Each structure stands twice: as structure tokens, then as C-alpha cells.
């Protein structure tokens, strides 16, 4: 329990009283509680899919959540995060930019690589934003957020012909053993790709139950045999009793 409380404090939830019931938490609070549960679980060789962990966070707390996500990665796991916060982009070992715009003009892989090179991609709205804000941050701050170097992938998950909502026949490679951030403008199809196609696809390959009710289609998935399990962390309530509290 002491270790769990340490994680809760680390993600800015030190103000929660232990008698507070889970169903009374906000979406952002519930998601961060779920993250602390995962961080203290000692799971390894697991793919963690996290949808916008910075949602509802004060800027001062974003770095704390980034630290927890990096701890999960450093324990021997793969983390795929849907995010747009600059601090997450800086911390990423690998970035996937979905776009180039929203709706019918989205759902395509615009860029795959490290954060630094994304700023030079003219087609990417995220890249243009990064280029415009580059002067606000020093190189040392960037390095501190990510670490001394980008981690190299120990393998790849290859998802082909993903289709759901705005995502049409999109083929993407996800690096294993690193922190991979999936970014792009709102409505580009980030969550559709990750939550509604990638996560269910891996669940199917691993013969693991899937918590997503409506799933997309895909042509194939390679590399799932390199991971042991997959976990989705979003804003849905944790499974368990309505009387569960943040410490349990």
C-alpha cells in the first residue's frame, strides 16, 4: 500500500482521500489511478496502450505522469501513448504522426521516427507546431525529458490495412521495448487506430479478452508473439467493486 501511495502522489493525486470511492473520480483521475496500479504491478514484456494520460492535468503534473510512463517502459515493457503534449513528444523514443488533418483528410501515417526530425515535415501540423515552438526550449531540456539517447526497438509490431472511422487501410509499425507516442490533430484517427484496431488485434493474437466493444478491421498483425500480454489504460472505470478506492 505504501508503494501504491507513492505512485499516487507522483502523478499528482496525493490529495485524494483513501475512503473516496472510484466511481466518484473524474475521468482523468480514474485514468491516473489505473496507471499507478499498472506501475506497481511488476508486469514485464507487456504492451501498454494509454489514451491521452495528460487529459485534465495541470502543466506541473504532466512531467510526473511522463516519469511514471517511463518507469513502466524501463521495467521491460512497450508503451504506446496517444498524446499531443510537448513533454510527451520530447520523452518519446519513437513518434507516429497521424493526419495530415481531421475527418476525411486524416487517418494516414504522416511520419514515423524521432521527435527532432518531425519538426521538418511540412505536411505535419504537429511538425509545424514543433518548429514554431522550438526556440522556447533548450536542447538540454529536451534531452532531460527523453534521456540521453532514444532507445532502440527490440522488435516491431506490424499492423497492416487498419480501417476504422477516419482510418482507412493504414499500415503502421510499432517499435517494441520503447515509449512510442502517437500524435496528430484532433479527429485525425489516433484513438481509432490504437484503441479500436491495434489493441483488439493484439488481444486476438494473444487470445486475451478485449474490453473494447466496437472494433475496427485490419489485414494482418505480425510480431505479437514477442510480447506476453496487452493492457489498455483509458478513462473508463477500473473493473471491481463500486466501493473500490484509489489504494485498492
Language-model features, listed with the residues they occupy:
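Conserved phosphate-binding elements of NTP-dependent enzyme cores
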Residues: 1-248
Amino acid at each position: 500500500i505504501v508503494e501504491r501511495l507513492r505512485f499516487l502522489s507522483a502523478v499528482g493525486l496525493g490529495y485524494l482521500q483513501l475512503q473516496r470511492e472510484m466511481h466518484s473520480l473524474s475521468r482523468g483521475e480514474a485514468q491516473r489511478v489505473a496507471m499507478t496500479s499498472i506501475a506497481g504491478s511488476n508486469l514485464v514484456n507487456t504492451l501498454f496502450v494509454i489514451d491521452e494520460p495528460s487529459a485534465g492535468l495541470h502543466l506541473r503534473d504532466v512531467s510526473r505522469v511522463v516519469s511514471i510512463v517511463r518507469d513502466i517502459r524501463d521495467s521491460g515493457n512497450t508503451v504506446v501513448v496517444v498524446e499531443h503534449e510537448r513533454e510527451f513528444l520530447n520523452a518519446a523514443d519513437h513518434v507516429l504522426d497521424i493526419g495530415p488533418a481531421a475527418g476525411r483528410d486524416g487517418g494516414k501515417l504522416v511520419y514515423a521516427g524521432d521527435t527532432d526530425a518531425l519538426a521538418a515535415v511540412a505536411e505535419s501540423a504537429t511538425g509545424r507546431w514543433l518548429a514554431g515552438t522550438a526556440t522556447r526550449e533548450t536542447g538540454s531540456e529536451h534531452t532531460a525529458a527523453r534521456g540521453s539517447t532514444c532507445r532502440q526497438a527490440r522488435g516491431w509490431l506490424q499492423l497492416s490495412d487498419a480501417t476504422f472511422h477516419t482510418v482507412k487501410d493504414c499500415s503502421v509499425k510499432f517499435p517494441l521495448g520503447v515509449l512510442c507516442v502517437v500524435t496528430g490533430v484532433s479527429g485525425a484517427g489516433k484513438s481509432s487506430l490504437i484503441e479500436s484496431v491495434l489493441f483488439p488485434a493484439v488481444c486476438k493474437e494473444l487470445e486475451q479478452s478485449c474490453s473494447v466493444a466496437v472494433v475496427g478491421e485490419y489485414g494482418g498483425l505480425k510480431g505479437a508473439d514477442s510480447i506476453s500480454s496487452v493492457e489498455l489504460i483509458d478513462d473508463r472505470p477500473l473493473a471491481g467493486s463500486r466501493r473500490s478506492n484509489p489504494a485498492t
